[in-house]
Amino acid sequence: MNSVAIALAICTAGAVAEVLAAGTGVRERFAELCLPRHSPPLEVWVAVGILYYAVCFIVAYRLLRGSWNPVRSLPLALLLVLMTANALWNYLFFRRKALGASAAAFVPYTILAFVLFVSLLGVDRVASRAFFLYLVYLFYAAWWLFALRRANTTSERAA
């Protein structure tokens, strides 16, 4: 099997896991939350998800291409764990509606993403640059998630 097909299979499996973990009430979940200022609409979040999987594909492809090198094992394993953790976050946020748990899970997720980035630096420059874009996005995601939690904790207390 070639590296493009394997990378595509990895990303497809990750996307399917994410959709299954989130469940069917994604739009309703967004509607019931008090969103922070500067929150994009759900369609933009879908586009962000597509870009996330494009980055994951680039990273997976770059790690899988050519003859196998054991040095690529760690970043590839970290990528798979990160994609699994992303599905877990969707489960906590959408299906369980556990805003506090999803915020708590975001902390080790971000650390894992940073460790993946560092591991990519010594292995593949293109993959590390592509993944760096995702790390930049995570700063906004962190602000948004914690602002969301604050807004909804405050609105729950006021009710």
Predicted regions and their residues:
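Membrane-helix boundary connector in multi-pass membrane proteins
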Residues: 91-99, 115-129
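Cytosolic, membrane-interface loops and tails of multi-pass inner-membrane proteins
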Residues: 24-40, 149-159
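Terminal transmembrane helical module of multi-pass membrane proteins
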Residues: 119-159
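Interfacial segments of alpha-helical transmembrane regions
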Residues: 2-9, 71-80, 127-130
